[in-house]
Regions:
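A short, well-structured edge-of-sheet supersecondary motif
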Residues: 29-54
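Small-residue-rich helix-loop
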Residues: 51-53, 255-433
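Sec/Tat-exported extracytoplasmic proteins
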Residues: 73-82, 99-101, 108, 117-124, ...
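Acidic helix-start/capping segments at beta-turn-to-alpha-helix junctions
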Residues: 85-103, 128-140, 213-218, 223, ...
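A small/polar active-site loop signature that marks catalytic segments
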Residues: 146-150, 160-316
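Short, well-structured active-site flanking segments
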Residues: 76-92, 309-314
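Active-site SXXK
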Residues: 62-80, 129, 240, 372
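Polar, glycine-rich mid-to-C-terminal structural blocks
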Residues: 103-177
Length: 433
């Protein structure tokens, strides 16, 4: 019989009441060296008092923690009730899509629009499907920078929308997406909506752009067929943050550039742009700079901003043990009595600046709430091991503060197509009516 090896779990509920000597041992693990070699961190209580800090002012690449700044920026500029509007217009034989910058329009959203078009009696477009520069469907992993290659962008997005509109063009994943949406929203899964595009696809010129069409014919008058309005902004931000989706950079088309985001934070905090704060992207890709202390300040600012609207961090960030996404790389944080105690954001880069993995958020303990940022710089060759070390650090912190205070999971993270609104203008009355 193989003897069992004793394991000291400083993050367990039992650790919260262990004898004094063992408690001291767990606290030593939080000190420089110990089991945390290579980590840097900064921790504050709910009121902003520094609890502990190790290289908290070290300039680091924050990776996807930049998405916290982008979320704050979007909320301040647009407000929590904001919905992105996408208009579907009839223009002669063509269907024109005027995007409103919705960064999270998916095939599921296209299914709902197709159903609305069907209700209006539209099942076939004899002309073309044209989309403008502010329309996206599906994901690009942050590669689609707004404003770059508008012709290529329009061609790709129009082709995706055409496929989503026509079940005969669906692949297996698109069909599965329809069945899941139908199940969630009580639709007839055996009768999917269908809008066939008989003509080609391409770019719809922006309304403000002066351009002569290649065809020597007048541009026909347009009429609104359907207006699709996204779910309110917080739900969209939560989806991007939970999956650490770099397509959050699509918000630049609505808000401004990464340089504008940097200026927003610098002016808001009244600090200079230097190696403590330097942003080159709104997604976290590239060589951005932030300190652990400023990452915690960013979390606090986001938390306080959300509270103005009776919201909290869990409305825009995932909850360990409750939500899908990248927090599952830290599985112990959502188990047992810890479930619901931690709300946060992950960040990782494999090669840039030697690689880094970070975890920042708020954790509820028996001693109160704590805001934290922990990072493992130069960990590109061993991200999994670095995440395990960060997880152990946070478990030990919880234990030192009396243990985690778990909570029931709240409203589930919205799925694609959930929470949207459709405006379907009444068809024009026949002449003489």
């Amino acid at each position: 019989m193989t003897p069992r090896r004793a394991v000291l779990d400083c993050g367990s509920q039992r650790a919260a009441v262990m004898p004094t000597l063992l408690t001291v041992f767990c606290l030593l693990l939080l000190a420089p060296g110990g089991g945390n070699r290579g980590l840097v961190w900064h921790v504050e209580d709910a009121g902003g008092r520094v609890i502990r800090s190790r290289h908290g002012d070290r300039s680091l690449n924050p990776a996807s923690l930049v998405k916290l700044a982008t979320s704050l920026w979007a909320l301040e500029r647009l407000g929590p009730e904001y919905r992105f509007g996408t208009r579907f217009l009839g223009a002669g034989d063509d269907l024109i899509v005027r995007g409103g910058g919705d960064p999270d329009f998916q095939p599921e959203n296209a299914f709902l629009v197709a159903a609305a078009l069907n209700r209006a009696g539209i099942h076939r477009i004899t002309g073309r499907l044209l989309v403008d520069d502010l329309f996206w469907i599906g994901w690009e992993q942050g590669k689609g920078v707004p404003g770059q290659d508008p012709e290529g962008h329009a061609g790709q997005m129009a082709a995706r929308l055409r496929r989503a509109f026509d079940p005969d063009l669906w692949d297996g994943s698109t069909r599965e997406a329809w069945m899941m949406l139908a199940q969630r929203q009580g639709l007839d899964g055996s009768n999917p909506p269908r809008v066939v595009i008989a003509g080609g696809t391409g770019r719809a010129w922006p309304d403000s752009e002066k351009r002569v069409r290649a065809e020597a014919r007048p541009i026909p008058a347009t009429r609104v067929l359907v207006v699709h309005r996204s779910r309110p902004l917080p739900g969209t931000l939560k989806r991007f943050n939970a999956w650490s989706n770099n397509d959050i950079n699509r918000l630049e088309a609505t808000l401004g550039s990464a340089s504008d985001l940097q200026t927003f934070l610098a002016e808001r905090w009244q600090i200079e742009v230097n190696d403590s704060l330097r942003l080159v992207s709104s997604s976290g890709l590239g060589k951005n700079r932030l300190t652990p202390r400023l990452a915690v300040r960013l979390l606090r600012d986001l938390r306080d901003t959300l509270r103005r609207w009776d919201l909290d961090l869990s409305d825009v960030l995932p909850v360990a043990g409750c939500d899908e996404g990248t927090l599952k790389s830290f599985p112990a944080l959502g188990r047992g009595g810890r479930r619901g105690s931690m709300v946060g954001k992950t960040g990782s880069l494999t090669t840039t600046d030697g690689g880094i993995t970070l975890l920042a958020g708020t954790v509820a303990t028996e001693s109160g709430s704590r805001l934290f940022c922990v990072a493992a710089p130069q960990s590109g060759s061993g991200l999994a091991a670095a995440r395990a070390k960060e997880e152990r650090w946070l478990l030990d912190l919880m234990a030192a503060l009396g243990g985690a205070r778990g909570a029931r999971c709240g409203t589930p993270m919205p799925q694609a197509g959930d929470g949207v609104e459709l405006e379907e203008p009444a068809p024009p009355a026949p002449p003489g009516s």
